[in-house]
Regions:
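Fold-core signature of tandem repeat domains
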Residues: 45, 79, 87, 96, ...
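Short loop/turn segments that connect beta-strands within beta-propeller blades
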Residues: 9-14, 58-63, 99-104, 142-146, ...
Length: 186
């Protein structure tokens, strides 16, 4: 029932710091431990569990952590941080999740045309891009207004898109585990 985190030296792999988050699963129903992470511009780590949360913030300087339960009936999957350092997550149960650490409130953004949020990343223009299943599609949301733009961007021939990456030119890449391809979207 402990979330274990290690910060490694990028040059040689040595362990620099260790943080253990006690009571990782206070509800006794999390079937996944820490599941992904995102580092904000200040070097702090956001991470979450699946089935449900928690959401955890680890300060990159002090290594002190804060912990919040995710909203009921949600199951965070992918995670990223926006320009304000706030975490955004794909929701395995459908939709996107945003957490405001100042107000300690959640935004749940529904995706009515697709039901399984997966990997997520935010581009330099502040748009969140999320892979989604059931049916497979690409989702686009505006992080400034916290609103859905589209949840039905087609990926012709897709099977199970699982992740998102954005290259230096701003192209969105969507790897698909069943189709064994990566889609390039602008």
């Amino acid at each position: 029932n402990i979330g274990h985190f290690e910060r490694l030296d990028g040059g040689n792999g040595d362990t620099l710091d260790v943080v253990e988050v006690i009571d990782w699963d206070t509800q006794g129903d999390t079937d996944w431990g820490p599941y992904g992470g995102a580092v904000n511009a200040d070097g702090d780590l956001w991470t979450s569990g699946r089935g449900p949360g928690p959401l955890v913030f680890i300060d990159g300087d002090t290594l002190v952590y804060d912990r919040w339960e995710t909203p009921p009936e949600t199951s965070p999957y992918g995670i990223t941080a926006d320009a304000n350092g706030h975490p955004w997550m794909g929701d395995w149960n459908g939709g996107l999740l945003h957490f405001d650490p100042t107000t300690e409130t959640w935004d749940i953004i529904d995706t009515p045309n697709t039901s399984r949020g997966r990997g997520i990343m935010i581009d330099r223009n502040g748009f969140a891009w999320m892979a989604s299943n059931n049916p497979c599609a690409l989702v686009k949301a505006d992080t400034a207004t916290r609103t859905l733009i589209r949840d039905d961007i087609e990926l012709p021939g897709c099977g199970t898109p699982v992740g998102i990456s954005i290259d230096a030119e701003g192209f969105v890449w969507v790897p698909d585990q069943d189709a064994s391809v990566a889609f390039k979207v602008h």
